[in-house]
């Protein structure tokens, strides 16, 4: 983190140095242009005297006004730069670095996603979409099962079909009746044998 901070400060410092150099070159170019302008003005002044054009004093006043405006613009730019340092507003270079960092993070995220996708294909791990489809399929099956159960319950109420509990209750008395009949048969058989023995004696 400290290395990144130092790198950012170094880049920012180099950017400011480059900016100051550019401003110095711009000022020199403007001075050269002003000198050329003065030379042209002198030539024009001679024409003005000859043809009655406005004097060079008026152009000088206009040029000084433009120079004052340029100086005010530079002062505003310097004040804005000081505000960025004071309040932590990012400069153009910092914004560029931040944007490049975000782009690198997005690329790394895409690479991780591609690597995960390759692992899924290689080892058969279900992707997020497949898990979602499987979960939705299971939910649909559960809903269909519940609907079938509700439909069966409605049929039982409508047509008098016994439910599982009712079938079990109905089957129990039948079993008791069968046991009772079997017991009666055994009793009759025993007493019949005894009656035959008595008659034989």
Curated annotation (Swiss-Prot):
Tissue specificity here reads: Expressed by the skin glands.
Pfam (any one):
FSAP_sig_propep
Instruction: State the compartments where it is located.
Output: Secreted
Listed GO MF terms: opioid peptide activity
Task: Name a single GO cellular component.
Answer: extracellular region
| Modification D-allo-isoleucine, positions | 190
| Stated name of the protein | Dermorphin peptides
Organism source for this protein?
A: Agalychnis dacnicolor
Lineage, highest ranks first:
Eukaryota, Metazoa, Chordata, Craniata, Vertebrata
């Amino acid at each position: 983190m400290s290395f990144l901070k130092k790198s950012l400060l170094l880049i920012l410092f180099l950017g400011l140095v480059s900016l100051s150099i550019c401003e110095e070159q711009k000022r020199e170019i403007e001075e050269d242009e002003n000198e050329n302008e003065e030379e042209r003005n002198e030539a024009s002044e001679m024409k003005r005297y000859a043809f009655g054009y406005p004097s060079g004093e008026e152009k000088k006043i206009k040029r000084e006004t433009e120079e004052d405006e340029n100086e005010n613009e530079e002062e505003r730019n310097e004040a804005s730069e000081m505000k960025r340092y004071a309040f932590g507003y990012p400069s153009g270079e910092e914004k560029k670095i931040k944007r490049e960092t975000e782009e690198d993070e997005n690329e790394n995220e895409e690479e991780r996603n591609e690597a995960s996708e390759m692992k899924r294909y290689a080892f058969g791990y279900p992707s997020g979409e497949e898990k979602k489809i499987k979960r939705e399929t299971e939910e649909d099956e559960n809903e269909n099962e519940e609907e079938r159960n509700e439909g069966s319950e409605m049929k039982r109420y409508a047509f008098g079909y016994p439910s599982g509990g009712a079938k079990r209750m109905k089957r129990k008395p039948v079993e008791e009746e069968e046991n009772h009949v079997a017991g009666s048969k055994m009793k009759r058989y025993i007493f019949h044998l005894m009656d035959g023995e008595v008659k034989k004696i």
